[in-house]
Amino acid sequence: MAAVSTTTRKALRPTSRDDFEIAIVCAKALEYDAVCLLVDGFWNEDGDSFGRAEGDLNTYTTGYMGGFNIVVVLLCDPGEAAAAGATASLRSSYTRITLLLLTGTCDVVPDAMGKELLLGDVVISDTVVQYDLGSHYPNGRESDTLGDRLGRPDKNVRSIIMIFKTELGLQRLKEKASIYLEKIQHKASKEQRRKATYKYPGSTNDILFKSTYCHKHYRSPQCICDDYNEAGDRVCDNSRGTLCEQTGCDKDYLVPRLRLEDKKKLEDDDNVKAAQQPSIFVGRFGSGYTSLRLAIDRDRIAQKHNIIAFETEGAGTWDELSCIIIKGVSTYGDGHILSDLKSWENFAAATAASVARGLLDYYPQTDRWPSVESKNQTDTAFGNQADIACLRDLYITSPPDDRIRIEQTKGGLLMDAYVWILQNDAYKQCLAWTITYAYF
């Protein structure tokens, strides 16, 4: 693999909220922690100096990442409603955000697009469908209802997503994500409390049951779980939060997968770096109020609406700002609960943060012209009027203004320069000396 460079340049220190271009939103603390490990530096280590708009209840973390000034938001609660409210408030305080990245964890359709999707892989949104299943459990589940597909991404988002639908763009992003994942793991390893938090849980712990094999109590004749069938009979409430090892879920019903065999070989060769590298997929998210808990529901909705992953916040952020959802796979949305679920959640949060960070290396920075607020804050920082006047003169002019000025002169600039030369004292003196010298 060719060496891949990463961007760590420092952004100019912002003078106001208008200087922030990128927002990152996370629903859980573990997702926020993973993102913050990739922030190159923080602007609010000594307190928040940028404030927020009236009525905005968000708490912001500000810093820079890959040359961009960024603002990170941790939702007060997971879910669509909290995401929608937080994003609307974000937009009112940070009015110049050009891109919002919603990062975190998701449930995946393991055989979407005819491919094998594994735990720790990352899904990037190209579209989002909002769904509401009612109850997602076998007992009393309602028929699924889906709203219209949410608004089409704007050109800003579509242009960057199209790059990652190409083999070249996707491979480059994958290589960068691998580097940033190692960076997260290295930084976390320096802290005893979370030394192994983002460690790859291993291919043997990536377990997928057949879609028809429900998570319930087995070998319990007195339990209502014993009467369950695929038509929708009840399972007991206690089974929903119980580990597969305790319910008696039989590993004879596991699905074999070729990619896991490849990862196992890499691990046997002590090449964990290659084994943990996530694959990246671009496709449609399903966004609902709660997570899926039944594989047959997952597969039915996915097949009908071409969905490859499910999550719970995207519908709340999608239409508020230019948004890309980037989420790591932590479960298969089938209700099965593994003993190392927490490890997969942390690892998936890290892979998602790594892909989000890699994406920013390809996102073009927008030319910025100083806002009135920025100029006023600069004026306040310098008391000397001469300094203020000098700083104002140094502000870069706007190309549209320059174009208008040049068009209005209609070639006059050349004439003005010619006249200036002829009237210049140094030129006149030189000309007089030349004429005098010519007479001798």
Summary of predicted features, one role per range:
Residues 2-379:
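Intrinsic-disorder/coil detector with helix-boundary
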Residues 6-13, 385-440:
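N-terminal flanking helix/linker immediately upstream of nucleotide/cofactor-binding cores
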